[in-house]
Curated annotation (Swiss-Prot):
Component of the ubiquinol-cytochrome c reductase complex (complex III or cytochrome b-c1 complex) that is part of the mitochondrial respiratory chain. The b-c1 complex mediates electron transfer from ubiquinol to cytochrome c. Contributes to the generation of a proton gradient across the mitochondrial membrane that is then used for ATP synthesis. The gene is MT-CYB. The chain crosses the membrane at residues 33-53, 77-98, 113-133, 178-198, 226-246, 288-308, 320-340, 347-367. This is Cytochrome b. Heme b b562 binds at H83, H182. The keyword Kinase does not apply. One of its GO terms (molecular function) is metal ion binding. Belongs to the cytochrome b family. Heme b b566 binds at H97, H196. A ubiquinone binds at H201. The keyword Heme applies. It comes from Ctenomys pearsoni. One of its GO terms (biological process) is mitochondrial electron transport, ubiquinol to cytochrome c.
């Protein structure tokens, strides 16, 4: 008689994905972020569901309902701050996960990679709409500024913005639809994650050497399940430390002031995880140009498989490319810092230089360095 785990139609899928999955024996801790993102997504859906039970999507009561959650609901403060800081953890892991993919050449799995980029877009959209829901000052003005960018689209722009707003400004209709989208998108993301995994399991995981590892595979369970649990433990310690000690560390104090359309905050800025893209947007004086740069700063990830010119897949044995990779990381950190600064000298100039370097590194320096490394190795 065959094992139920291997014969049952449903359990069989889980078995092939998480138990008997042949996995390279040499994958490092950088491969932990996939499972951590899965846990984050589950945590966000769960905490979000409980928040939705007490939240009201109405301009007059939204801010009060969030206050009510924190003050009157049993452990409401915990659920709210786990959800807010859980989003920050989600993006930290997302960026690490993408960085790992770039460093080790995982983008050569084109189907998996492209679905991953779409997942990033969906997650960014979800996070943006979630930030609007508490209806504080930064929620309202963030929504106004970002949705207004769509008016830069030629011909249909202004009509499109009013259509998204559901009126002539960000108001009740906007809040209600943002809540609806914020609720449904995580489930769409979950479906996309399943497709992401489906494509990944067609090819098998990459590994630090970037070489084929078919001759050296081990079962996922127990080796990598225990490794993932360790990662989850570290994640929960970090998240709970944030929630318990400094829950507002990554938030904006302006969001503790109820939304007021008549009073603009001195510095409108998004959450920290969007600051790099916001800096790129602001570094171009033209509205449409800024919007295109913003979109392309993320969309450029889809070009990585096309721009890959090295004979080696991974950067493990390519010191020059490694230098460029870390230069790119430093560049993104500079952009993140600039995104949070006011629009004045010298920040504008630094932002423009960092934005130019970002695109120049990815589009020109990295492919040409890879070609040079091929030459040096006489390949």
């Amino acid at each position: 008689m065959t094992n139920t785990r291997k014969s049952h139609p449903l359990i069989k899928i889980v078995n092939h994905s998480f138990i008997d999955l042949p996995t390279p024996s040499n994958i490092s801790a950088w491969w932990n972020f996939g499972s951590l993102l899965g846990v984050c997504l589950g945590l966000q859906i769960l905490t979000g569901l409980f928040l939705a039970m007490h939240y009201t999507a109405d301009t007059t009561t939204a801010f009060s309902s969030v206050t009510h959650i924190c003050r009157d609901v049993n452990y409401g403060w915990l659920i709210r701050y786990m959800h807010a800081n859980g989003a920050s953890m989600f993006f930290i892991f997302l960026y690490f996960h993408i960085g790992r993919g770039i460093y080790y050449g995982s983008y050569t799995f084109m189907d998996t990679w492209n679905i991953g980029v779409l997942l990033l877009f969906a997650t960014m959209a979800t996070a943006f709409m979630g930030y609007v829901l508490p209806w504080g000052q930064m929620s309202f003005w963030g929504a106004t500024v970002i949705t207004n960018l769509l008016s830069a689209i030629p011909y249909i722009g202004p009509t499109l913005v009013e259509w998204i707003w559901g009126g002539f400004s960000v108001d009740k209709a906007t809040l209600i639809r943002f809540f609806a989208f914020h609720f449904i998108l995580p489930f769409i993301i979950t479906a996309m994650v399943m497709i992401h995994l489906l494509f990944l399991h067609e090819t098998g995981s990459n590994n630090p050497s970037g070489m084929n590892s078919d001759s050296d595979k081990i079962p996922f369970h127990p080796y990598y399940t225990i490794k993932d649990i360790l990662g989850i433990l570290f994640m929960m310690i970090t998240l709970m430390s944030l929630v318990m000690f400094t829950p507002d560390l990554l938030g904006d104090p302006d969001n503790y002031t109820p939304a007021n359309p008549l009073n603009t905050p001195p510095h409108i800025k998004p959450e920290w995880y969007f600051l790099f893209a916001y800096a790129i947007l602001r570094s171009i004086p033209n509205k449409l140009g800024g919007v295109l740069a913003l979109v392309f700063s993320i969309l450029i990830l889809m070009l990585f498989p096309i721009l890959h010119s090295s004979k080696q897949r991974s950067m493990s044995f390519r010191p020059l490319s490694q230098c460029l990779m870390w230069m790119l990381v430093a560049n993104l950190l500079i952009l993140t810092w600039i995104g949070g600064q006011p629009v004045e000298h010298p920040f504008t100039t630094i932002g423009q230089l960092a934005s130019t370097t970002y695109f120049f590194t990815i589009l020109i320096l990295m492919p040409s360095t890879a070609l040079m490394e091929n030459k040096l190795l006489k390949w």
